Amino acid sequence: VDYVEAAGQLASDIDGWLSDREGEVLYELAKAVPPGQTIVEIRSWRGESTVWLAMGASAGNGSSVYSLDPQGEQGPGVGDLKETYPAMVKNLSNAGVRDGVTILSSSAEVAALRRRRNVGLLCMGVFQDYDAIRSAFVAWKPHLLAAAVVAVKDCDQPGPSCFVEEYLRQSDDFSIVRTIDTTIIAAYDSCVHYWVIDSVDSGVCQHCGRRRTFRALPRWGKAAGAGK
């Protein structure tokens, strides 16, 4: 049985914006999560990406999948999230993965405070607003384990794109490892960096060889509030 193909067929019946290539990468990332670590997805909408994650987890080490969707919020381009909950439950049940997914109907910030979760994969989706994705990420960053992976979807939109630039690409803590269509994958960097910075504010770590710029970053928040 080609489980990746099976996941794609099941996910294809669900409304969403994920490409097959993005779904396959989420599947492989979920499959690779080590035993004892969890997968957290924030804002799945109707469960398209959740199916990929749950089937990948099942094919791998059986990691628990938590999907956070605050009910009753209005999302630009996605409508009332309260109306998507029944559809999400139905879609996960139809795909045969409902028992492997815990749906948390609360905001990312509230859910992060309720219980410590050892997160090996954090998937950020259906965000258009910079401040919203930043707030959710800041709340869940303390739950990330060493070498955890962060996947940010919809990076063709200003909010997620600017978030990735400021909090992942220009951060000492993360390295961008892959870009697939509109999804950007980053790895939690365990290196204790020792930066040597040149005259044009470009630095290289003497331990791992990573390079980054130390030029002042623009203020993204105000400019990145546009939705889809």
Give the label of every model feature segment.
Residues D2-D13, G23-Y194, H207-A224:
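S-adenosylmethionine/decaboxylated-SAM
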Residues L18-E22:
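Phosphate/oxyanion-binding active-site loops and adjacent basic polyanion-contact surfaces
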Residues I197:
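Alpha-helical and His/Cys-centered functional microenvironments
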Residues S202:
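Residues immediately within or flanking Cys/His clusters that coordinate Zn2+
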Residues A226-K228:
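Low-complexity, charge- and small-residue-enriched intrinsically disordered regions
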